[in-house]
Curated annotation (Swiss-Prot):
Family: Belongs to the PP2C family.
InterPro entries per record: PP2C, PPM-type-like_dom_sf, PPM-type_phosphatase-like_dom
Organism domain of life: Eukaryota
E.C. designation(s): 3.1.3.16
Gene Ontology terms, MF aspect: metal ion binding; protein serine/threonine phosphatase activity
Keywords from the named record: Hydrolase, Magnesium, Manganese, Metal-binding, Protein phosphatase
This protein's name: Probable protein phosphatase 2C 48
Catalytic activity: O-phospho-L-seryl-[protein] + H2O = L-seryl-[protein] + phosphate; O-phospho-L-threonyl-[protein] + H2O = L-threonyl-[protein] + phosphate
Keyword Metal-binding part of the UniProt annotation: yes
Residues noted as binding Mn(2+) 1 in the record, renumbered to the chain: D90, G91
Cofactor(s) the protein needs: Mg(2+); Mn(2+)
Length: 353
């Protein structure tokens, strides 16, 4: 109940300010910054003020030029003490790094604005706090869907950024009390580390994948693309790498089925709609890893969980994982340029004393 009560109080303050200001999601960015007690946009760490959460972030440039990955961690997101937003974005194409940064800056305020609207409307329709608590997951889902649609439309209308042949993936989560909401657009991945009984009567950390890697060859993705007259094919020199192609051209081919930008293939089945899932965090859940495909291409879910769990200090957990991935690239994929590798490790509880 405390989460909804304090949230509604924060919304009242925010909405009273909003009456004095008109504008779109870009203008709302200032309000979003004001409601976050701390924001981390680079490699580093961030302690959760008033909570037990702790985030470690690391990104390493690959061998393909500029690092097109970027990330954000917002503590105190949505006017709520202990609420956290994490996001990781992977650009592609000539201007992919700009697209990734644009989405990183636009998505949090767009999401916050839709969340405010959804909660306010729900309170007017059925003002009971119990009912609001019950419908929180669905409100977050609605907010994410609306926010991602708005961000993609804003990006398409932008005169400052060419996102026709460039785009980015976006994986983000909101921790709101014991509720964890995860939204995924593209092929980055979120993996939860949770305690599971082992054969010896003790406990081990198990890896639970929370997201789907949205590749074009997934049955539901391929079906949508084909219905929109797009093609899903592999190049002769890239066996196993399925790409989305326009029906009348050979390139460029997109290696994921969901993304922001990439308007050259948006009419052929590529979408920016996220898959939104949720779960309740328990005492058995230790941390969650958000990482770009540069990490997951060479590191298994189980390996990632063990690497993070075995870090001598939480501050070095993300760095340890990313550096392991870079070494794995050079060992497993010799002759292939190392991809950008980025990770966020969000710990839910204080370390044991």
């Amino acid at each position: 109940m405390r989460h909804i009560s304090s949230l509604l109080q924060g919304l009242a303050r925010s909405l009273s300010v909003g009456k004095e200001r008109k504008g779109g999601d870009g203008d709302d960015g200032k309000a979003a910054a004001a409601t976050a007690t701390a924001v981390l946009r680079t490699s580093g760490t961030l302690w959760g003020e008033g909570s037990e959460t702790f985030a470690a972030v690391c990104s390493r440039r690959g061998e393909k030029g500029i690092n097109q990955d970027c990330s954000i961690v917002c503590e105190g997101f949505g006017c709520e003490e202990g609420s956290v937003l994490c996001g990781i974005f992977d650009g592609h194409g000539q201007w992919g790094h700009y697209v990734a940064k644009a989405v990183r800056e636009s998505l949090p305020p767009a999401l916050l604005r839709r969340w405010r609207e959804a909660v306010t409307l729900a309170a007017l329709i059925d003002g009971g706090e119990k009912r609001l608590c019950e419908c929180r997951p669905d409100l977050w889902r609605q907010s994410y869907l609306a926010a991602c649609a708005a961000v993609d439309a804003e990006l398409r209308a932008s005169r400052r950024l060419d996102a026709v042949h460039s785009g980015c993936t976006a994986l983000s989560l909101v921790k709101h009390g014991d509720l964890l909401v995860v939204a995924n657009v593209g092929d980055s991945r979120a993996v939860l580390a949770t305690a599971s009984p082992d054969d010896g009567g003790g406990a081990r950390l198990a890896a639970v994948q929370l997201t789907v890697d949205f590749k074009p060859n997934l049955p539901q993705e391929r079906e949508r693309i084909m219905e929109c007259n797009g093609r899903v094919q592999c190049l002769a020199d890239e066996p196993g790498v399925h790409r989305v192609w326009r029906p009348d051209r050979e390139g460029p081919g997109l290696a994921m089925s969901r993304a922001f930008g990439d308007y050259c293939v948006k009419d052929y089945g590529v979408i920016s709609a996220p898959e939104v899932t949720h779960r309740r965090i328990t005492a058995q859940d230790h941390f969650v890893i958000l990482a770009t495909d540069g990490v997951w291409d060479v590191v298994s879910n189980e390996e990632a969980v063990q690497i993070v769990a075995s870090a001598p200090e939480r501050e070095k957990a993300a760095k340890r994982l990313v550096e392991f991935a870079v070494r794995a690239w050079r060992r497993k994929r010799r002759g292939i340029a190392v991809d950008d590798c980025s990770a966020i490790c969000l710990f839910f509880h204080s370390p044991p004393s």
